[in-house]
Amino acid sequence: MGLSRVRAVFFDLDNTLIDTAGASRRGMLEVIKLLQSKYHYKEEAEIICDKVQVKLSKECFHPYNTCITDLRTSHWEEAIQETKGGAANRKLAEECYFLWKSTRLQHMTLAEDVKAMLTELRKEVRLLLLTNGDRQTQREKIEACACQSYFDAVVVGGEQREEKPAPSIFYYCCNLLGVQPGDCVMVGDTLETDIQGGLNAGLKATVWINKNGIVPLKSSPVPHYMVSSVLELPALLQSIDCKVSMST
């Protein structure tokens, strides 16, 4: 790590600042209720949602070939057909997809203590939101949780030539804020993108948010720091700056 003070912090969005996984689970529960009450599905409702969850986790999205709405509606259509058999039911798939999506967005909120932390941090350093993913999906989340006003800049991977962990997107972020990689800290919950990307770009430090106490694989990227909550960040940044003061 360099001997300059931290001048900028890059934050991941999903499962770092907002509980995307929890919001997604709530969306799935609403779909299960719909399938059971309106369409009289029984255990098939949960099986369908489990199948969709697997499809989402393996999703490969190419914006030049299709739109995210079509792709994700197809996940539901395939899951329903795989579970129930018979002809494809696009109309039901659309109903499930839009209920899941709207419920999910309703529950994507910035907690009050996270808002307070960002507000205080921004008095000391520049803040940038750096999120991977499809442009439409991520912009809808950003609008739903009303987080844009807490940042000096917002960068969505799906709008750039490359996403995390490519160094180029980190250099782009540095240029936006007028800082050097050695001035910046990356904070995120995903070792393979947030942490590896920060390491690839030569950032001052990487901070892994490990809410569930996961033991990483030996082959995983090694973060400079690990915390269980993003709310631990202000104290950690102070400690990083103290090390700089003692070294200079």
Curated annotation (Swiss-Prot):
Gene that this sequence comes from: NANP
GO term, biological process aspect, one: glycosylation
Assigned GO CC terms: cytosol
The protein's required cofactors: Mg(2+)
Coiled coil: none
Keywords annotated in UniProt: Carbohydrate metabolism, Hydrolase, Magnesium
Superkingdom, taxonomy of origin: Eukaryota
Pathway assigned in UniProt: Amino-sugar metabolism; N-acetylneuraminate biosynthesis
Activity regulation field: Inhibited by calcium. Inhibited by vanadate, sodium orthovanadate and phosphonate.
Organism field: Homo sapiens (Human)
Name by which UniProt lists this protein: N-acylneuraminate-9-phosphatase
EC number: 3.1.3.29
Binding-site positions, Mg(2+): 12, 14, 189
